[in-house]
Amino acid sequence: MVLTNPAEIRNPAAPPEITQGLSENVILTTLDDLYNWARLSSLWPLMYGTACCFIEFAALIGSRFDFDRFGLVPRCSPRQADLLITAGTVTMKMAPALVRLYEQMPEPKYVIAMGACTITGGMFSADSTTTVRGVDKLLPVDVYIPGCPPRPEAIIDAIVKLRKKVANDSIQERGKLLQTNRYYSTTHQMKPTAPLLTGEYLRSAARQAGPLPAAAGAAVAPQLPVTEKEGRDRA
């Protein structure tokens, strides 16, 4: 009969000690979680500001709000950014440049529409034919920030919501999570009309210049003689 040391007796119903030791040194996760954690912790924005909304975003750089705690590092090149923040009015002339900046950003990339002028065109879309009535007509927008202009606290809330969206992304299902609808805005309805500036106002008698001596109330000195060669040189 062989006697076993009591210290070597193991309870078969208890969790094994090997697993307990590994659990303290090994992190079990998925590729999506690791990939999303790295991206949401280092969002590098490209700031596209054309109006007063951009000043509110600039307030986040200060110590009061400190947007560096979210891992935001502003970049000057679209090839180094993964977040495009549009703040201000977008015109027809600037639309191709904005789309080009978005196309130069590497995938995956996100867009935040900041302010009423960016979302719907704002007050400029009422009587302007050159204002884009909603940046979502050009780019897929992930987060909207309404306001004129929105407060820095609203921008932080949008960053937090975007981080939650990034955390739920899946590499395999990313194609199914693309934007399917747009923010409700008025479409452009261009109607050709006759030009208002016909030149008749400038040709009116009231706009014609009167005699110079009478207007100035003083005599005008005679003009200096100009030779034929000097006249050709001036022409």
Swiss-Prot record:
Membrane topology: Peripheral membrane protein
Keywords: 4Fe-4S, Iron, Iron-sulfur, Membrane, Metal-binding, NAD, NADP, Plastoquinone, Quinone, Thylakoid, Translocase, Transport
Catalyses which reaction(s): a plastoquinone + NADH + (n+1) H(+)(in) = a plastoquinol + NAD(+) + n H(+)(out); a plastoquinone + NADPH + (n+1) H(+)(in) = a plastoquinol + NADP(+) + n H(+)(out)
Cellular localization per UniProt: Cellular thylakoid membrane
Highest taxon of source: Bacteria
Example of a GO cellular component annotation carried by this entry: respiratory chain complex I
UniProt-listed Enzyme Commission number(s): 7.1.1.-
Required cofactor(s): [4Fe-4S] cluster
Role summary: NDH-1 shuttles electrons from an unknown electron donor, via FMN and iron-sulfur (Fe-S) centers, to quinones in the respiratory and/or the photosynthetic chain. The immediate electron acceptor for the enzyme in this species is believed to be plastoquinone. Couples the redox reaction to proton translocation, and thus conserves the redox energy in a proton gradient. Cyanobacterial NDH-1 also plays a role in inorganic carbon-concentration.
Quaternary structure (record): NDH-1 can be composed of about 15 different subunits; different subcomplexes with different compositions have been identified which probably have different functions.
Name of the protein this chain belongs to: NAD(P)H-quinone oxidoreductase subunit K
Originating organism: Synechococcus elongatus (strain ATCC 33912 / PCC 7942 / FACHB-805)
